[in-house]
Amino acid sequence: VTFVMRPAPWGFDGRVWQDIKGREIPVDELTPGAALGARGMLERFARTYAAERGSFYRAAAAATRADGLPATLAAELDAAAERIEGDAAQDWVQGTILWRALTERVEA
């Protein structure tokens, strides 16, 4: 079963998933195994997003240097990449309501 994050009809609260067929499933109704899989998907999303964004910022910083633009701009782009790479992405995802709800369900 493939799950994607979707806002609940009453507003995003981080506790509702929508499956591939469009059915909305509250996190509380997922089996612990499905919640574990969903949590893994969320963690992979954070790592992938951080890697892609980090690469974008690093490439922009390199282009800035190559084009002779101010060094402060390149430094800001490098700093932006550092803020979202590696542990920062994992810390962010573990701070979300959805990750905590899935973890509670896994441990239930």
For each predicted feature, which ranges?
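Alpha-helical propensity feature that highlights long, continuous alpha-helices across diverse contexts
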Residues: 1-108
